[in-house]
Amino acid sequence: CGDGDMQEGVTYEAASLAGHLSLGKLIVLYDANKVTLDGPLSMSFSENVKKRYEACNWQVLEVKDGNDINEIHKAIKKGKKEQFKPTLIIVNTVIGFGSANQGTNKVHGAPLGKEDGKNAKLSYGFDHDEFYVPEEVYEDFKKKTIKRGKSKFNKWNKLFNEYKEQYPTEAKQLEDAIAGKYSLNIDELLKNYPVGHNDATRNTSLEVIQEVAKQNPTFLSGTADLASSTKTKIKDEDDFSVENYNGRNLVFGIREFAMVAIMNGMTLHKGVKVSAGGFL
């Protein structure tokens, strides 16, 4: 994320909830270049981001030089070791590094121009006028990134095949969930609600939610501190919490914006179906 993201309300909502839920696998890299489109960040933002995230129960690491790849790598490795807190890595960078206008808003949303682009490349020791990717970069990518990906993929497949042998039913459920395959039949239930049915829609919704939850074990429901009003709670199921990540009721707190963003992310990731309710 960048300096602009740190000013958005949804960022705080999501960070607060992630810290509360001790999401230790979450690592965020913050590109701190202290420049926004209209000028220096100091015009509109003076918070101590490190202290804010520490207050939200995050581990906060800092890389002094954003051009030092090894330091970034070390910080990510340290972030992976932390199991009980999300990690924010503040990476201090210079926007437009190598350009004549580096460190200013002039390189925020505008092209460098041919001459300045050429000079920026020369400052890196890269003597090419046009866009060019050296062959050794392709080779390095194949050797490190693709080979590493294949190795991890094969290792995961081996582990999953062993899991399938030991837990065939659960493995099938997982495969179906990832593929978005599930059976759902609420035709009989819907017969209870003919046109003109005289009841609050949230009461009807509550009954439908219970039936969907019964038929689909990957279905989760949540709300922004309004479960008693919007009637979104799955009965006889626990809340999702630090103590119980198996809970099917998502407690977002009064964080409506983050609730919607998180649900979008969960849906795109696949493996679960989610719903939530709120007030407009």
Task: Please name every model-derived segment.
Residues K143-I146, K150-L280:
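Thiamine diphosphate
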Residues C1-K144:
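Glycine-rich ThDP/TPP pyrophosphate-binding loop and its adjacent helix/strand module
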